[in-house]
Amino acid sequence: MPYYTKLGSLPSKRHIQFRRPDGGLYAEEVFGTEGFVGPTSTLYHINPPTQVMGWKPLYSTKVEYVERATMRMRHVKSMPMKPKGDPVTGRTVLFGNSDVEIGVCVPKEPMKYHFKNAAADECFFIHFGSGIVYTMFGALKFGPKDYIVIPKGTIYRMEFEKPAAGEPAPRFLLMESVNGSHILPPPRYMSKKTAQFLEHAPYCERDLRLPELPMTFDEKGKFEVRIKSRDQVHSYMYSYHPLDVVGWDGCYYPYCFNIDDFSPIVAKHHMPPPTHQTFEAHNFVICSFCPRPLDFHPQAIVVPYNHSNLDSDEVLYYVEGNYKARRGIEQGSLSLHPQGIPHGPHPGTVEASIGATHTNELAVMCDTFAPLFPTKAAIALDDLNYPRSWESGWTPEERSAAMNGSVPGGAASNRSAAKTGRKSAKSTAVSKKGSAAVSPRRSGGAVNTWS
């Protein structure tokens, strides 16, 4: 993790006697990575963490991918997903490969157990909902637009508050490093000598929210910890509460970071997506596209240029903002633009963007360095007309005809793209504070710049 910290009670040195009030020894646990040479924390438990009552395999977590040989643009609409399961069992993987799994969770039930992912780091982006993640390192309060990074091996329980009347059900995007690598700030943001965030980084230590008290639960009984490993979830039973740590220190722990605390980097000309990078792991990166001033050259084109990212697949999760520059895109949409074919602005959006001074977009992107494959769940939510949304509308005459449904890919033949696009622009274009988004216009307007 980014830097050293500590919480709770600790002895003066590592690996010395540290006694409980009853005279017994606290159980020290070195919780580390990369064979004792990677980020590590040292924890002190009331009970021996090795004391297990019983265990059994529960269910498989192996993901089945489909259409592995198909290369095309995809648009998955996640908002119709029905609440199911809890914050673990309710997760639905939509895209993935041997490096990362990307999905959405709309939980319906509370967790009645604790969970440990012993195979991967997890990064959640909270779209809707607030609550607390109770971890072995302490409690993390979270709310909308928080990233939550939970490193491999952390025991936790995620608890959502009941939404108030009229508020949307809890929902979060999830990215899991199934290749076993760690999700960390990009090295270029960090000092090589001190692990401190450098001055050019778009966020820093002050923006991270670390675990807080309560941390210690000194309880006896029957407690289940479900552990994900080897493509299985296993049930382990303990006679004591698994969150029994009285103190810890080190550089390996979970934390929260709110996307609104990301400070976008702006420039005279359009900047590439790595400018918005927030985290990275082996073979994938996570980026944050946030509201910001746009490029300020007098003749700037402020939307992305057409690009062929020949080594990456790109998934964008649309959080809020102005969706008019994307046909059919709405809140909660996930678009997949694969390596091998170029992608870029939709017809008419380049001209419409000229003169815009700012963008109110908010989106999370995951770029991978190996092809992504869809699951059956993604196929069931896929807009089959999305690849045709670039087909027409490149001239004023085509755009007018498309609105009348008289050209291929227009409103009639591309009903999903055009109809849904008009609906989403009206009903889901919301600004940061929930007000209607500003329409793109030639001078001083707002525009979305999603790539």
Q: Over which residues does each language-model region extend?
A:
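Jelly-roll (double-stranded beta-helix
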Residues: M1-S451
